[in-house]
Amino acid sequence: MTNLQESLPKELLRTNRSGAYSCSTIVDCNTRKYHGLLVVPVPELDDENHVLLSSLDVTVIQHGAEFNLGLHKYQGNNYSPMGHKYIREFDCDKVPTTLYRVGGVILKKEVVFQHYENRILIRYTLVDGHSATTLRFRPFLAFRSVRQFTHENATASRDYSEVDHGIKTCMYAGYPDLYMQFSKKNEFKFCPDWYRGVEYPKEQERGYASNEDLYVPGYFEMDIKKGETIVFAASTSEIKAVSLKKLFDKEVDERSPRDNFFHCLVNAAHQFHRREKNDDRYILAGYPWFKCRARDTFIALPGLTLSIEEDDYFELVMKTAMKGYYEFMEGKPVSVHIAEIEQPDVPLWAIWALQQYAKETSKEECFKKYGQFIKDVISFIQDNKHPNLKLEENGLLYTDGKDKAGTWMNSTANGRPVVPRTGYIVEFNALWYNALCFCASLAATVGEEDSQQKLLAQAELTKQAFLDTFLNEYGYLYDYVDGNMMDWSVRPNMIFAVAFDYSPLSQDQKKQVLDICTRELLTPKGLRSLSPKSGGYNPVYVGPQTQRDYAYHQGTAWPWLGGFYMEASLKLYKRTRLSFIERQMVGYEDEMSSHCLGTISELFDGNPPFAGRGAISFAMNVAEILRALELLEKYQY
């Protein structure tokens, strides 16, 4: 913990399942503009999260000597006040717990984010102390969007009001009040000041501005005795101070352990939940900067819910998403907060997600709850009502992606797609064939024979065109085909044609595709987005925005693709691939103690040492590894 080169890259995330979060490094030194102790949505201002309370510095005072446990990075590679040197232990199996030792003083800090409330709770316990001890708490306030910085200014309000064992304050109009309260009566000393030149090195690495000033209104001070606990709460609403200790205990009791790989992933899955005031339910695409996105929602939903026996949340999210997609199909303004719902593969992934639901419950149950929606989506596609998904006479779907990316490989540079996938997209048409066959099986289950035969006829047409269009002489699949232009790049999108329950490929063709994915794309962190043997391979995701955009889908490795790869392997080779897949899991399990603890980063460099990059926690990655673990267990028994 005292070695900053080792501790600063490790981050910690906790959420309230309603969009708010708390995030920093394990030594509480903020290294991103997205870091903060209390980061909450402020819908009255915009659709971004906002950092209200950046950090809380604690100072231990004995015999007039002060020992500040805080840590900030300032310009010029200066770290102050170096409180990390007092850390003796850190653990986050259930709740993040830090043990500080200052001379004869041992102070324990535990942190929990109250579910469904914008309230962070921190419990301090004086485990040992042989002299009179005082704690001083100095809050660092930001009151700004996660995408901006704050600087010293004359506009910020210095006003505050006393509340139960604390104060409330608000720096700018439009923001909610920030309540800072303690379980114990204390003295607040008003001495406003700006701490200037706080620096965030992760933003420097990403080519962005990286400096800001933070406002400190003063400090709280109180005595603490050996064995005593004090609970601090920061929130957008007031709470009775006398209830804080019981509330902390209650929240801890509700937490499940993070004592193994599976439990870490389950906890990570819950962090993507978002419940809004109208009871709409969502899946966030990732932390700390992603919002809810349609494609991510449908890909991640089965793994984040069905694979951990949480069918109820699947149904709640699907209810919200269906409402939004019906609005889109009907040409109405979309009322739900799901971005990119117009993307052409979204309806295809929605049907795939419902296919997983049918396998978890039954086809009868799936048809009863979602049959009409599935029919409506199929008709929407067949009637060519989607603005960028055209069903052609050969049975394949055509998408225009020349000027605006329409697939998950959506990075742009200078206003143009970096990977201009256009025409017949391989995974779109694998999804379409799978959807047609699945819908035909649903129709058969409920006795709709005419519908079944029509769907099967459409599927047969699509199958033949798929083979004629995508299968090349080397045994793998073109990534996309547009007229006479065939993209020969070896990319992972062909893995879906092997992994899906219904595939136009024969067993031998599947094996050929899987083999080339294994040889050229497989890494310990998922499948590369491009083979090293293909032109334009760029496996390291670092540098300014444009540099990263060019690398985003040109060789970086993605764990969620690894999930589909493992599914394809198990379906083709059954139990003979169990030990191989178990070894693959080691690469993901290692991530539980790297980068953001207990979860999986967005993407990884395509070359050793396969460093984690991008968002610190990514829903599709967590979901697909959970789904692969479930599949692994099924094939073991």
Task: Describe every region a protein language model picked out.
Residues 1-257, 261, 288, 310, ...:
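Terminal accessory carbohydrate-recognition/targeting modules of carbohydrate-active enzymes
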Residues 68-95, 102-106, 383, 515-525, ...:
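Non-catalytic C-terminal accessory modules of carbohydrate-active enzymes
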Residues 119, 191-223, 228, 328-349, ...:
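The feature captures the catalytic groove of carbohydrate-active enzymes
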Residues 137-140, 354-356, 373:
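Transmembrane beta-barrel strand/turn architecture of Gram-negative outer membrane proteins
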Residues 250-287, 316, 530-537:
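Conserved oxyanion/phosphate-binding beta-strand-loop segments in alpha/beta enzyme cores
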Residues 265-278, 308-330, 372-391, 404-406, ...:
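Long, well-ordered core segments of solenoidal/helical folds
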Residues 279-297, 335-336:
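Internal amphipathic alpha-helical repeat/solenoid segments
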Residues 290-321, 493-505, 514, 566-575, ...:
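Alpha-helical support elements that line or immediately flank enzyme active sites
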